[in-house]
From Swiss-Prot:
HAMAP family: Ribosomal_uS9_B. Pfam families: Ribosomal_S9 (PF00380). Keywords: Ribonucleoprotein, Ribosomal protein. InterPro entries: Ribosomal_Su5_D2-typ_SF (IPR020568), Ribosomal_uS9 (IPR000754), Ribosomal_uS9_bac/plastid (IPR023035), Ribosomal_uS9_CS (IPR020574), Ribsml_uS5_D2-typ_fold_subgr (IPR014721). The lineage of its organism: Bacteria, Pseudomonadati, Pseudomonadota, Alphaproteobacteria, Hyphomicrobiales. Disulfide bonds: none annotated. GO terms for molecular function: RNA binding; structural constituent of ribosome. This is Small ribosomal subunit protein uS9. The keyword DNA-binding does not apply. The gene is rpsI. Belongs to the universal ribosomal protein uS9 family. GO terms for biological process: translation. GO terms for cellular component: cytosolic small ribosomal subunit.
Length: 155
C-alpha cells in the first residue's frame, strides 16, 4: 500500500479532472459537429461569415418553411449573441422536419463551442448542448398504441 504520510501531495479532484476546452477548427477555418434529435442526424459546419444558413444545399427559410422551425434553428446563435456572425452549412437526414430542426440546433450549438469555447457556459445554461433523448415509445402487443388499450366492454 502506498505511503500516505503527506496529504498535500494529493491534488484535489476538481482541479485534476476539470476538462480544458480548446478551439477545434479545420484548415478551412470551420468547426464540425454532429447533432441528433429523435431519428434525425445532422452534420454541421460553422465558420465566421455573414450569417448564411444552408441546409441540404437549400436556404434554411425554404427548407424549414414554418417560422417555428426557423426560430428553433437560430436559438443557439441568439442565446450566444452571435446572430449574423457565422455561416452554417448542414446536411441532415432521417426523421421529420421538427426532429431535423432540433438536430441542426444541437449540431450548431456543439460546433459553436468548438469554434469559440468561451460560449460553452451560455449554451450549456440554455440547454442547447444536451442531447434530447426523448424518442417515440414502441407499440406493445395487446395494445392499440404504445399505451392506449383497445376499447373495453363489460358485457
Amino acid at each position: 500500500m502506498a505511503d500516505l504520510s503527506s496529504l498535500k501531495d494529493l491534488a484535489p479532484a476538481s482541479e485534476a479532472s476539470a476538462p480544458v476546452h480548446v478551439r477545434k477548427v479545420d484548415t478551412l477555418g470551420r468547426s464540425y459537429a454532429t447533432g441528433k434529435r429523435k431519428n434525425a442526424v445532422a452534420r454541421v459546419w460553422v465558420k465566421a461569415g455573414s450569417g448564411k444558413i444552408i441546409i441540404n444545399g437549400r436556404d434554411f427559410t425554404t427548407y424549414f418553411a414554418r417560422p417555428v422551425l426557423q426560430m428553433i434553428l437560430q436559438q443557439p446563435l441568439v442565446a450566444a449573441a452571435r446572430a449574423g456572425q457565422f455561416d452554417i452549412i448542414a446536411t441532415v437526414a432521417g426523421g421529420g422536419l421538427s426532429g431535423q430542426a432540433g438536430a441542426v440546433r444541437h449540431g450548431v450549438s456543439k460546433a459553436l463551442t468548438y469554434f469559440e469555447p468561451g460560449l460553452r457556459p451560455v449554451l450549456k445554461k440554455g440547454g442547447f448542448l444536451t442531447r434530447d433523448s426523448r424518442v417515440v415509445e414502441r407499440k406493445k402487443y395487446g395494445k392499440a398504441k404504445a399505451r392506449r388499450s383497445f376499447q373495453f366492454s363489460k358485457r
